[in-house]
């Protein structure tokens, strides 16, 4: 499982002309689910989303010390199978991505665990397997790329 985590001032997802998810200050998280992902991969990404310290303390004197829960932030969780690409020449190939029916179950499990371990009203999502327009107001910018198969 891969995740691109961005610190944002706000974010929204529009699908079929309707805003389907939006947040204020927090994290926008793009998630790619691989064919061989397990519950352990989901748990790793979950822990990182909730635990990653990308905000300073309140007076700004110490950087990288607070996570999304500590700032009472929100999470915009968006499925993005294209993160699982491999390049075949100049063309991306997505055979490493989990099939949509199975990926939806994994994505929903991640969403539900985030809501359970943080707060249901703090977790917004896009529409799974739909074309979406994503609008973000990046803060920093701060962007982190995680891969559950390459843990540090």
Swiss-Prot record:
NCBIfam families linked to this entry: D-aminoacyl-tRNA deacylase
Any one of the GO CC terms: cytoplasm
Primary site of residence: cytoplasm
Record keyword Hydrolase present: yes
Motif Gly-cisPro motif, important for rejection of L-amino acids in this chain: 140-141
Protein's UniProt name: D-aminoacyl-tRNA deacylase 1
Entry's EC annotation: 3.1.1.96
Description of its domains: A Gly-cisPro motif from one monomer fits into the active site of the other monomer to allow specific chiral rejection of L-amino acids.
PANTHER family: D-AMINOACYL-TRNA DEACYLASE 1 (PTHR10472:SF5), D-TYROSYL-TRNA TYR DEACYLASE (PTHR10472)
Organism the protein comes from: Leishmania major
Molecular function as annotated in GO: D-tyrosyl-tRNA(Tyr) deacylase activity; Gly-tRNA(Ala) deacylase activity; tRNA binding
Catalytic activity: glycyl-tRNA(Ala) + H2O = tRNA(Ala) + glycine + H(+); a D-aminoacyl-tRNA + H2O = a tRNA + a D-alpha-amino acid + H(+)
């Amino acid at each position: 499982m891969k995740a691109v985590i961005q610190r944002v001032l706000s974010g929204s997802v529009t699908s079929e002309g309707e805003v389907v998810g939006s947040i204020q200050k927090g994290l926008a998280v793009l998630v790619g689910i691989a064919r061989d992902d397990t519950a352990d991969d989901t748990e790793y990404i979950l822990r990182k989303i909730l635990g990653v310290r990308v905000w300073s303390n309140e007076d700004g004197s110490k950087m990288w010390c607070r996570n999304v829960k500590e700032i009472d932030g929100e999470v915009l969780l968006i499925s993005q199978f294209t993160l699982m690409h491999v390049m075949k020449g100049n063309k991306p190939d997505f055979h490493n991505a989990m099939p949509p029916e199975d990926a939806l179950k994994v994505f929903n499990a991640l969403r539900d665990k985030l809501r359970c371990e943080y707060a249901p009203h703090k977790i917004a999502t896009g529409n799974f397997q739909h074309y979406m327009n994503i609008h973000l107001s990046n803060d920093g910018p701060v962007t982190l790329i995680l891969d559950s198969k390459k843990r540090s």
